[in-house]
Amino acid sequence: MAKPTKKTGSKKTKRNVPNGVAHIQSTFNNTIVSIADTAGEVIAWSSAGASGFKGARKGTPFAAQTAAEAAARRALEQGMRQIEVLVRGPGSGRETAIRALQVAGLEITLIRDVTPLPHNGCRRPKRRRV
């Protein structure tokens, strides 16, 4: 009979990363917060869906705040102190996510809006009639 082999999972090493970049992608349906180091390697991430919200509640400002707090907590464990914030998208959770990062203890050095704007590219979706 074959002996059971012991599987060792990948160990996450605790790195000391003092500063980095927080990418906040805020759509109408969800908010995703990724915190990376200066080389671009993601240290921590969270989203409204990963924070336990489902359906239409993922697009709320409170869900964005919860996601940003969770990502900031993980980044602080890795030793991050200063971040630049790059915001993308038209969602309602943009400002609350930035405020949540600040309240969590991260010092924000720069806020930049990097929402992609088409130079008359694809046709827009039709208007909703409610």
Curated annotation (Swiss-Prot):
Is the keyword DNA-binding assigned to this protein?
Answer: no
GO cellular component labels:
ribonucleoprotein complex; ribosome
For this UniProt record, the keywords arranged alphabetically read as follows: Ribonucleoprotein, Ribosomal protein, RNA-binding, rRNA-binding
Q: Which domain of life is it from?
A: Bacteria
Q: Which GO terms describe its biological process?
A: translation
Key word Secreted present in the record? no
A molecular function annotated in GO for this UniProt entry is: rRNA binding
What HAMAP family does the record tag this protein with? Ribosomal_uS11
Q: Which PANTHER family match?
A: 40S RIBOSOMAL PROTEIN S14/30S RIBOSOMAL PROTEIN S11
Subunit details for this protein?
Answer: Part of the 30S ribosomal subunit. Interacts with proteins S7 and S18. Binds to IF-3.
Assigned protein family: Belongs to the universal ribosomal protein uS11 family.
NCBIfam families referenced in this protein's UniProt entry, alphabetically? PRK05309.1, uS11_bact
What's the stated role of this polypeptide?
Located on the platform of the 30S subunit, it bridges several disparate RNA helices of the 16S rRNA. Forms part of the Shine-Dalgarno cleft in the 70S ribosome.
Name this protein carries in UniProt = Small ribosomal subunit protein uS11
- The organism is Prochlorococcus marinus (strain MIT 9313)
| Lineage summary | Bacteria, Bacillati, Cyanobacteriota, Cyanophyceae, Synechococcales
